[in-house]
Design a protein with these regions (language model features):
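C-terminal motif of bacterial Sec signal peptides marking the signal peptidase cleavage site
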Residues: 17-20
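Bacterial lipoprotein signal-peptidase II cleavage site
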Residues: 22-27
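Soluble metallo-hydrolase cores and metallopeptidase-like ectodomains found primarily
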Residues: 28, 106-109, 120-158, 239-284
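Soluble non-cytosolic domains of exported or imported proteins
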Residues: 34-41, 56-67, 81, 133, ...
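A conserved hydrophobic secondary-structure block that centers on an alpha-helix together
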Residues: 139-223
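N-terminal capping segment at the start of a domain
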Residues: 29, 34-60, 76, 82, ...
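Bacterial N-terminal signal peptides that target proteins for export
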Residues: 1-9
């Protein structure tokens, strides 16, 4: 475990607003003078520069980035949050998940072996030495969404979720639609993001979530998923509270075979999953 200095853009903006409001007009005018389009452009260019190395935790680039942000805070007159410091300490753990190669899915028609990085990727953000998913039951849970404003709950009716791994579709039900009143149409909402699906799986108490990858729905090719799976993961020391034991992705064709072996057509299920009336389907 290591301590890491972090500062977020949200903190910068929030501090600017509340500090400015609580001080004199000169301070407000100073804040206005630096909060310009040109200043934000320079700021964005600076922290996205190659020298910051993607702001990867514990890297020299991340150190450059946070020190730059701290200087910017000082220049615009923001108050430090801890004595004379603009930094806070956060406990961060780096980990790497070793997965079975292949992972085998059991179906009514036999077994489907999925090669690591080619057929699937998986990781665990839990601070545990081993995650056991042997004999976990797979459930097709549509888009993996709980959205009361659209009358949609793709997990409704799942029993004993701690023993289940949900297989869900990337993106949201608005994909390919012109109806902006339903999940914002073809513009992805947060419900369509992979992070949301993993978060919702944890809220539902599931053992795991596997997202069906499809280039158009994800917005990027499988190579991005594969590259990410080979990198170290950085999580905070309380990550067990809001992560499933297992999260991952499977290739579209692998999911297609899995569903076909259970008597379902993947394209038909994708269409059915767009409806608020969709209910999860147990896979044997």
């Amino acid at each position: 475990m290591r301590n890491m200095k972090i500062i977020t853009c949200l903190l910068t903006i929030t501090s600017l607003v509340f500090t400015a409001c609580g001080r004199g007009s000169n301070d407000i005018e100073k804040a206005k003078s630096v909060a310009t389009t040109e200043h934000l452009k320079r700021y964005t260019e600076a922290i996205s520069h190659d020298s910051c190395q993607g702001r990867k935790p514990f890297s020299e680039g991340a150190e450059r980035a946070v020190n730059y942000i701290a200087r910017q805070m000082k220049e615009v007159g923001l108050k430090p949050i801890d004595g004379d410091s603009y930094f806070q300490q956060v406990n961060i753990i780096s980990s790497r998940t070793r997965c079975p190669d292949p992972m085998v899915l059991k179906t009514p028609k036999g077994k489907i072996p999925l090669d690591w990085l080619e057929g699937y990727t998986a990781f665990s953000a839990r601070i545990e030495p081993e995650i056991d998913i042997d004999n976990a039951e797979l459930v097709f849970a549509g888009y993996g969404i709980v959205a009361p404003e659209y009358g949609k709950n793709d997990f409704e009716g799942i029993e004993n979720p701690r023993d289940k791994v949900a297989v869900v579709i990337v993106n949201d039900p608005g994909l390919g639609s012109d109806n902006t009143d339903y999940f914002n149409g073809d513009i992805m909402t947060y419900y369509g993001r992979w992070m949301y699906k993993f978060e919702e799986g944890a809220r539902q108490g599931l053992k795991g979530v596997l997202i069906i990858h499809e280039d158009r729905g994800a917005g990027y090719p499988w190579s991005v998923v594969r590259a990410s799976a080979q990198s170290k993961m950085y999580v905070d020391s309380d990550s067990d509270a809001y992560h499933c034991p297992l999260n991952g992705w499977i290739q579209f064709n692998a999911a297609k075979q899995l569903l076909a072996d259970n008597g379902y057509d993947i394209d038909q299920l994708i269409e059915q999953s767009k409806s608020p009336d969709f209910k999860p389907i147990s896979l044997k």
